[in-house]
Amino acid sequence: MPNTPIYQPAAAALQMVQSNQRVFVHGSAATPIHLMKELLAQKDRLHNVELVSITQQGIDLNSPDLAGHFYMNSLFVSESNRKAVNSGMGDYVPVFLSEIPLLFLRGILPLDVAIIQVSPPDRHGYCSLGTSVDIARSAASTAKKVIAQVNPNMPRVHGDTFIPFDRFDVAVWVDEPLPEVSYSEGANEVHNKIGKIVAELVEDGATLQMGIGTIPDSVLKNLTNHKNLGMHTEMFSDGAIPLIKNGTFNNSQKKIVPGYCVTSFLLGSKKLYDFANDNPIIKAMDINYVNDPRILSLNPKVTAINSAIEVDLTGQVCSDSIGTYQYSGIGGQMDFIRGAALSEGGKPIIAIPSVTNKGLSRIVPYLKQGAGVVTTRGHIHWVVTEYGAVNLFGMNMEQRAKALIQLAHPDHREELERSSFERFKH
């Protein structure tokens, strides 16, 4: 007989979590905030609980009071656990986003408990993983126990989102708003310039992937006159909504899931979540499908738009760390950089402002000591700043250096030219 879950208060339901267990926590807009706050409040009875997750919203896992009780074994570092990971209260697992489900499915990271957030069950007894299928589906299917936060505010999203209610060992009814994020608020003139330059690289009929951040949102604002665009992206944000409504994104040229916007998680405003609710044009699918370079490369003109922390003069891209300080993670950047490169007419793009908020150049002679190389100089193609765009594919290292210097801020070009001369003797 199927295991029939019983609704319980959060405090009682979380008694299922015990010391020395590995616990998966649903992420992004699907972060089960109510359950997580209750779990953290129970810290005194728990020791050495390993929390496995990607980006979390609405909770703080950085408090020194959690040391010894919880260990943050992060698959993608974010503000919620960044201090913890860099202070010894946790660590980071370098892994392509497309391969994270394999850690669960192959028993490399066996899960004792999965804490997820879902929509209420429909008349057939199925709940939706809603805004975040990503790695949650594989986690929920392999964990020994599943605790579900059932939230009427979670949209019922179409695709690979459905999970039977009787899969849960215990359920907690929580009526709370989903966390919201706005990427357009931080946009400035530089981001807008970059958005226009990248938009000029996007051809009609292209299939787009937009990474996380302000720049991808700025690109979307400049695509209103494009035609027959398709969407196959790990993340879906507010900027795509007007382009779907006006027919720019009609997905007519795609070879993989034609006619539908393919994504793996949604993160943005309540407007976005309402738009996705029971909207048949959106297909939210497992991350090991959406981000598989072999699959996405079958689409035409895949244009992958991602950002970075710094790029060296040979084209090495650091996107996950500031020196040895772990800032984020590998995520899906390489999945899409490679997939776009393999696509007929594809364009892998790294788009960055030329300088940081402190005025430091993002085009650098060498990456900082200890920095992680996410996109290698063998995988890099297009680089864009507010000063232009260049395709490094096929260039030797000296040619790359000269091209990248022209994308740097004028205040830093002379220093970069000296570094280039010292290295290449020309």
Q: Where do the protein language model's features map onto the residues?
A:
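Conserved alpha/beta enzyme-core scaffold
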Residues: 1-426
